[in-house]
Swiss-Prot record:
Disulfide bridge map: none
EC number: 3.6.4.-
Protein name, UniProt field: DnaB-like replicative helicase
Enzyme class name: hydrolase
Binding residue positions for ATP: 197-204
Keyword ATP-binding: yes
PANTHER family: REPLICATIVE DNA HELICASE (PTHR30153:SF2), REPLICATIVE DNA HELICASE DNAB (PTHR30153)
Protein's GO biological process: bidirectional double-stranded viral DNA replication; DNA replication, synthesis of primer
Single GO term (MF): single-stranded DNA helicase activity
Species, as recorded: Enterobacteria phage T4
Length: 475
């Protein structure tokens, strides 16, 4: 097969154009074949054209090969000939050959890495990659394909583009109308979407509410928890879907018969999606861990999600940064990029959450600079919503939602809006509000002013207490 490939690289222009972008010297065994390919590649790189047999012989004469290497290449070049072959068959067989060689090389590399890792630390080859590189090596080998698609042609593909505008194939709608309005029909597959909130404001509540809504719309949801137990997450979904409060479940106010009846009623609905909840230790899983989980779920449960929820990004680990770093910008940005890449690969909508900084915990407004983890997160995310809850909003069972970033539309339209919240049921609900965003902003503004006044009063009270304590400590 090697002689056939090298021959057609020289004599078949159509074949060369098709396979050359995927060819590499590492796919040939050391010896005449690899050396001949290197001569071809050197000529192509220098002259941007396919070499002739004469050009190869001249390059061979000018090479620094040993006598044995020279003899082997000379013999192989003399065997290269223009023999007719079916183009489709030849391309397909070449693809198989390259895939097999890539897998062989990857397996050999993995064995080297594993063997090196098993040695005592002082005897290890420090230049050898860590075992953490093994998944990337294998994934790269498995991804090799002679795919002829080279991108979207703005002029030639305008019809398909228009159809995609009309059918919104990449959009996954929300149950809540206001979210559909600001995203123009829903979040898109292959995107990273983030909820921002302070401690105990409702990051997990928002994610659970979204999960329950997506379920009712018929989508499969994978909920990955990095802190809460699987049963705790499922209990929140129970409270939402079964219309019972968390207290009712915890205090035994609902019997097993009632619980079973409600669950079976949902089972009868043919439009209901599936939910899988999986917990990992805090800081103990990364995007590669989630890839493995997705593969297992597909094989063992025939489960392929449309929505992936990671609760939450800041307590995941990076699959690229293995050494602890105090540079949170680099680490969080890496995790965000890896999760977004996972969403693109799996064609899913990925939701996660982020913590706001301490300075914004009691604030009635939040902006991009208030993200606690890293400024690298908004640089990567496609859509970010801040969840704001003042004392007044909490008393009214409402939360103020603010668009921080949006690639779905102009974030300044409906930049802020109110959402009803039922904490006992872990649910966001629509509330009646005016059809224009300005009215919502005015309502939000009055609540913000009141909240700032309350916070000022609390700060003054705290300062007075500290002054009194300081006076008592004087000698």
């Amino acid at each position: 097969m090697v002689e056939i490939i090298l021959s057609h690289l020289i004599f078949d222009q159509a074949y060369f154009s098709k396979v050359w972008p995927y060819m590499d010297s590492e796919y040939f065994e050391s010896g005449p074949a690899k050396n001949t390919f290197k001569l071809i590649k050197s000529h192509v790189n220098e002259y941007h054209s396919v070499p002739s047999i004469n050009a190869l012989n001249v390059a061979l004469e000018n090479s620094s090969f040993t006598e044995t290497e020279y003899s082997g290449v000379k013999t192989l070049i003399s065997k290269l000939a223009d023999s007719p072959e079916d183009h489709s068959w030849l391309v397909k067989e070449t693809e198989k050959y390259v895939q097999q060689r890539a897998m062989f090389n990857a397996t050999s590399k993995i064995i080297e890495i594993q063997t090196n890792a098993e040695l005592p630390p002082e005897k290890r080859n420090k230049k050898m990659p860590d075992v953490g590189a093994i998944p990337d090596i294998m994934r790269q080998a498995l991804s090799i394909s002679f795919d002829s698609y080279v991108g979207h042609d703005w002029m030639d593909d305008y019809e398909a583009r228009w159809l995609s505008y009309m059918n919104k194939a990449r959009k996954v709608p929300f149950k809540l109308r206001i979210l559909n309005k600001i995203t123009k029909g829903g979040a898109e597959t292959g995107t990273l979407n983030v909820l921002m909130a302070g401690v105990n404001v409702g990051k997990s509540l928002g994610l659970c509410s979204l999960a329950a809504d997506y379920l009712q719309l018929g989508h499969n949801v994978l909920y990955i928890s990095m802190e809460m137990a699987e049963e705790v997450c499922a209990k929140r979904i129970d409270a939402n879907m079964l219309d019972v409060s968390l207290d009712d479940i915890d205090d035994g106010h609902i019997s097993y018969a009632e619980y079973k009846g409600k669950m079976e009623k949902w089972r009868e609905k043919s439009t209901l999606g599936r939910l899988i909840v999986k917990q990992y230790p805090t800081g103990g899983a990364d995007a590669n861990t989630f890839r493995s989980l997705l593969n297992e779920l597909k094989l063992k449960k025939n489960f392929v999600p449309t929505i992936i929820i990671v609760d939450y990004l800041g307590i995941c680990k990076s699959c690229r940064i293995r050494v602890y770093s105090e540079n949170s910008y680099t680490t969080v940005k890496a995790i965000a990029e890896e999760l977004r890449a996972l969403a693109v690969e799996t064609e899913t909508v990925l939701w996660t959450a982020a913590q706001v900084g301490k300075q914004a915990w009691d604030s009635s407004d939040v902006n991009m600079s208030d993200i606690a983890e890293s400024a690298g997160l908004p640089a990567t995310a496609d859509f970010m919503l801040a969840v704001i809850e003042t004392e007044e909003l909490a008393a009214a069972e409402q939360q103020l939602i603010k668009q921080i970033k949006s690639r779905y539309g102009d974030k300044n339209k409906w930049n802020k809006f109110l959402m009803g919240v039922q904490k006992g049921n872990q649910k966001w609900v629509e509330i009646e509000q005016d059809s224009t965003p300005t009215e919502v902003n005015e309502v939000a503004g009055s609540q913000q002013i009141q909240a700032e006044q309350n916070r000022y009063q609390r700060n003054e009270s705290t300062r007075a207490q500290l002054d009194a304590l300081a006076n008592e400590l004087k000698f």
